[in-house]
């Protein structure tokens, strides 16, 4: 017969079990978004997506100096609640830049009924006139002028990489959490993005700032 637990044992439950109980309570009470994020980052083998790179630790959207093309100041943080797809590059926007804008537009369209949860952002890294040829592939995209030095401090780049190339994802909590490499494979990137939307389908923001 096993001896009854001592008073000391009762007063000090095993830490491992206590921590698991704590985290399960957090997952249940915090809602589907936190739970799905937990399983995407922690439970998935090796904690890696099938394509792209997780940004660890995540980087909250900082106070960037952003303006619309008409010069109105914009705080990107007010768009918390959306999945943000971000690309960057000079106003001249060459063929590769236009391809990126087209790709994120296709991602947006492929989101179907979840499109209202997605916002596309093009951060223009200079003060030059915007190439008029981009307005069609960038239709519906939030176009903002940005300070490239600020972006380099926030947006992670691979060795030898420039701002003009990757696609970055900001989650609805306002954290930069993933990047797709320069010249991304659009089909692979889309598959990962759709999985993120699916895994967070039950999470609804209390308020979504209307997009311009």
Residue locations for each model-derived region?
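Conserved helix-turn-beta segment immediately C-terminal to the redox Cys motif
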Residues: 41, 101-121
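N-terminal Sec-pathway targeting helices
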Residues: 15-29
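Short, internal strand/loop/helix patches
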Residues: 119-170
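N-terminal Lys/Arg-rich, disordered targeting/topogenic segments
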Residues: 1-16
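Short active-site neighborhood of thiol/selenol oxidoreductases, capturing the structured segment around
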Residues: 77-104
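N-terminal "domain-start" segment that seeds a small globular fold
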Residues: 27, 31-34, 43-77, 99
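Thiol-/selenol-based redox modules, centered on thioredoxin-like
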Residues: 163-165, 169-212
């Amino acid at each position: 017969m096993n001896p009854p637990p001592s008073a000391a044992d009762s007063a000090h439950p095993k830490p491992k079990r206590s921590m698991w109980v704590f985290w399960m309570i957090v997952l249940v009470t915090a809602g589907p978004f936190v739970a799905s994020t937990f399983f995407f980052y922690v439970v998935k083998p090796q904690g890696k997506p099938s394509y792209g790179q997780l940004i660890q630790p995540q980087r909250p959207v900082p106070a960037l100096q952003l303006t619309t093309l008409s010069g109105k100041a914009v705080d990107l943080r007010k768009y918390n609640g959306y999945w943000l797809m971000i690309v960057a590059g000079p106003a001249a926007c060459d063929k590769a830049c236009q391809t990126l804008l087209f790709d994120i537009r296709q991602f947006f369209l492929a989101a179907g009924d979840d499109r209202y949860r997605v916002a596309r952002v093009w951060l223009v890294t200079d003060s030059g006139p915007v190439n008029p040829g981009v307005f069609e592939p960038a239709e519906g995209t939030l176009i903002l002028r940005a300070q490239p030095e600020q972006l380099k401090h926030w947006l992670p780049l691979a060795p030898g990489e420039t701002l003009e190339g990757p696609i970055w994802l900001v989650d609805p909590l306002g954290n930069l959490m993933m990047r797709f490499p320069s010249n991304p494979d659009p089909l692979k990137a889309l598959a990962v993005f759709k999985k993120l939307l699916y895994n967070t389908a039950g999470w609804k923001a209390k308020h979504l700032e209307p997009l311009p």
